[in-house]
């Protein structure tokens, strides 16, 4: 694993008086090199100019990415946010935590049709549906899901862990074990929100404790079950994923957990638009995740966890968890890999590792990322209100093209 990027993001993107959103590395001014003198055999010092670095890349063409963790909601919110994902992503794993949740294959088929009806004309975007695992899910439902050809995974929400998770699992090794065994037989991946919900566990330790108490025993008990640890936030998660067999355990990574640490929640006042679950962690964890995803490992792939909420539900006394990143995600991932000197590994993370893990073909179309500054809108309006995007009002450097190259 390579070391973390030296140029990192610490400033809060929602505080306008702070420096620009990305800190730059210090310039390299050259070095003094000692060489021997052939006459007197004593060393002499000469100033050596730094080797000129190649000009920064201005354009990058990659296979069209997929989003392996996306919240699309329903109704007018779905209609407003879907074009942002469909513009740049070929497919997306669509989360099932609606009200009520998508617990059956029949409901997944209905939701899929709602998404397809909301697509912009001419869009080739493909929603990959998921089921919401409950204590009452049956092995027969897993068989139906596999047979449908449109349900690609089952999502585990520990009850009370995040938005609309109140119907989630309370007894994974008891009530859910027959379902998980059937999933292993059907090669149906389990997508895990990896946090315990015990009230005595510190919020910042919920992922670590989940790995120790739930995930590690689950992998040991069902080694053939394919598991995706969603939106990882800690070096503990990195270490666990890399201790597991490639092709059986993987992880999605969000832009916010690559670019922000927990300071971003509090700089310049409480920042509700940086609040998500799992919550942002300390800087050492962020660096570990950057190192992992930019190392070239096949066990990590793009999952934005883009989670739109109305502005009024974020800026209130009890705000919702979730960051709306779909419009800016590719720009931010490109920046992370550029800062790490790993743009050559961006395509595998965005476009190859995900479909390879799921056993799906890679996309054949291309998309272009250009170095062209653009300003993130303050809000996106929809019929019932406004949604504030990640890095609202900031200027980003990489601009994904709207036109695909075949």
UniProtKB/Swiss-Prot annotation:
One of its GO terms (molecular function) is dihydroorotase activity. Binds 2 Zn(2+) ions per subunit. It is found in: Mitochondrion. It catalyses: (S)-dihydroorotate + H2O = N-carbamoyl-L-aspartate + H(+). GO terms for cellular component: cytoplasm; mitochondrion. GO terms for biological process: 'de novo' pyrimidine nucleobase biosynthetic process; 'de novo' UMP biosynthetic process; pyrimidine nucleotide biosynthetic process. Zn(2+) 2 binds at residues 155, 193, 231. Zn(2+) 1 binds at residues 69, 71, 155, 305. Its cofactor is Zn(2+). Pathway: Pyrimidine metabolism; UMP biosynthesis via de novo pathway; (S)-dihydroorotate from bicarbonate: step 3/3. It holds the Pfam family Amidohydro_1. This is Dihydroorotase, mitochondrial. It comes from Oryza sativa subsp. japonica (Rice). The lineage of its organism: Eukaryota, Viridiplantae, Streptophyta, Embryophyta, Tracheophyta.
């Amino acid at each position: 694993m390579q070391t973390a990027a030296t140029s990192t993001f610490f400033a809060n993107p929602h505080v306008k008086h702070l420096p620009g959103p990305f800190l730059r590395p210090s310039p390299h001014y050259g070095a003094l090199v000692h060489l021997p003198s052939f006459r007197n055999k004593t060393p002499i010092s000469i100033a050596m100019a730094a080797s000129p670095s190649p000009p920064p890349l201005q354009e990058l063409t990659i296979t069209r990415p997929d989003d392996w963790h996306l919240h699309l909601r329903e109704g007018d919110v779905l209609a407003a946010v879907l074009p942002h994902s469909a513009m740049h992503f070929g497919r997306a794993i669509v989360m099932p935590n609606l009200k009520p949740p998508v617990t059956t294959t029949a409901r997944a088929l209905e939701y899929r049709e709602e998404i397809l009806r909301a697509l912009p004309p001419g869009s080739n975007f493909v929603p990959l549906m998921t089921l919401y695992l409950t204590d009452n899910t049956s092995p027969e439902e897993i068989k139906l899901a596999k047979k449908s050809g449109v349900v690609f995974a089952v999502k585990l929400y520990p009850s009370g862990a995040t938005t609309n998770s109140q119907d989630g699992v309370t007894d994974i090794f008891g009530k859910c074990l027959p379902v998980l065994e059937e999933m292993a037989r059907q090669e149906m991946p389990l997508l895990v929100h990896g946090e315990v919900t015990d009230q005595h566990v510190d919020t910042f330790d919920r992922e670590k404790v989940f790995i120790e108490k739930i995930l590690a025993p689950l992998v040991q008990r069902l080694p053939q079950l394919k598991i995706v640890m969603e939106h990882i936030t800690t070096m503990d998660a990195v270490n666990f994923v890399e201790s597991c067999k490639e092709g059986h355990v993987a992880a999605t990574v969000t832009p916010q957990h690559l670019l922000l640490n927990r300071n971003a929640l509090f700089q310049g006042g409480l920042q509700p638009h940086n609040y998500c679950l799992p919550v942002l962690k300390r800087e050492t964890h962020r660096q570990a995740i950057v190192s992992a995803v930019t190392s070239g490992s096949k066990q990590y792939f793009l999952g934005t966890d883009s989670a739109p909420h109305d502005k009024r539900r974020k800026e209130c006394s009890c705000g919702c968890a979730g960051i709306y990143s779909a419009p800016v995600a590719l720009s931010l991932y490109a920046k992370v890999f550029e800062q790490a000197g790993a743009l050559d590994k961006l395509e595998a993370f965005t476009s190859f590792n995900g479909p390879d893990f799921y056993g799906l073909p890679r996309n054949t179309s291309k998309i272009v990322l250009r170095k062209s500054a653009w300003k993130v809108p303050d809000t996106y309006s929809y019929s019932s209100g406004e949604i504030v995007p990640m890095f609202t009002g900031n200027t980003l450097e990489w601009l994904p093209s709207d036109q695909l190259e075949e």
